[in-house]
Structure formats: structure tokens, C-alpha cells
Amino acid sequence: MSARAPKELRLALPPCLLNRTFASPNASGSGNTGARGPGAGGSGTCITQVGQQLFQSFSSTLVLIVLVTLIFCLIVLSLSTFHIHKRRMKKRKMQRAQEEYERDHCSGSRGGGGLPRPGRQAPTHAKETRLERQPRDSPICAPSNASSSSSSSPGLPCQGPCAPPPPPPASSPQGAHAVSSCLDTAGEGLLQTVVLS
């Protein structure tokens, strides 16, 4: 350890200080007074050398610190600009989505005004049901028309006493409605034949 210490001191200290430190033990008492005279003049140059060495080391460390701070500031600026740009893009996307939704909603409301409402389609549906009921009721009208034609034919005399027509069976409300509709159609046909004749 004692041998390493002087080597480290030699590397750290400038040569003028090393010469003075190693020359001072060799000098003795009063005989060294003449040697101190020229050494006193060289002390100023030694101080300047020490100051220059310290300034060089300090300047190198200061340059390194400045470079590190600049790199850190650049990284922070890049991250902040990236986050700001990302927020702006999100806001633009939200605005575009709202505008598209408003346009679709307005166009749907305008287009829906021209379409017919469901309440207006009810009469047409009722008419269709009435038209569908008439062909269903037409087979019921056939036997009644046939019986009326056979009874009203004047060419065929009745042989013997004519039996009274059988009483109509008890009909349901639907059958009564069908018979009334058949009578209406038969009455219209008779009126047309009278007018034509």
C-alpha cells in the first residue's frame, strides 16, 4: 500500500509539485537556503500548472454534464410532443365520429318523413282481408243460388204437392255474414239484369 500511494500521487500531481515534494527531504538545514531562492520564483508557474490541470478536468466533466442534460431534454421533448400529437388525433377522431353520427341521424329523420306511417297502412290491409273473405264465402253462395234457380224455373211444373223448403240450420255468426254478403251480390245481379232489359 505504501508503494502504490506515491505512484498515485505522481499521476495526480503536476511535475513541478512532484519535484518540490521529492526535493524537499533531500535538502538540509541552512545549506538549503540558497536553493529556496530560485524555487520561490518557480512557485507561481507551479500554481498556474495546477490550475490549468484542474480547469481541464472540470471543463471535461462540465461538458459531459451538459451533453447528458441536452440528451435528456431531447428525450423529454420528443415524448411530450408524441403525447400531444396522440391527444390531438384522438380529439379529431371523436369529432369526425360525432359529425358522421349527426349526418346519419339527420338523413335518417329526413328520409323517414316521406315513408308512410304504419297507421296509414291499416285500411289497405282491411280491404285485402275483405277481398280474401269474398272468394272463401262464394262456395256457400253456390247452393243457395242453385236452390233459388231451381225454385224459380217456370218450365218445370211441380209434380204433386210441393214440399215446403226445409228450415235453415242454425248458422254461426260467420255463416250469417256470409249469407248476407251472398244475398247482396245476388240482389246486385238482379238489378243489373233489370236495367239491361
Curated annotation (Swiss-Prot):
Biased composition regions of type Low complexity, renumbered to the chain: 147-161
Skewed-composition ranges (Basic and acidic residues): 96-107, 125-136
First and last residue of the signal peptide: 1-23
Domain of life: Eukaryota
Topology of this chain in the membrane: Single-pass type I membrane protein
Keyword line: Glycoprotein, Membrane, Signal, Transmembrane, Transmembrane helix
Glycosites: N19, N26
Localization of this protein: Membrane
InterPro entries (alphabetical): C11orf87
Name of the protein this chain belongs to: Uncharacterized protein C11orf87 homolog
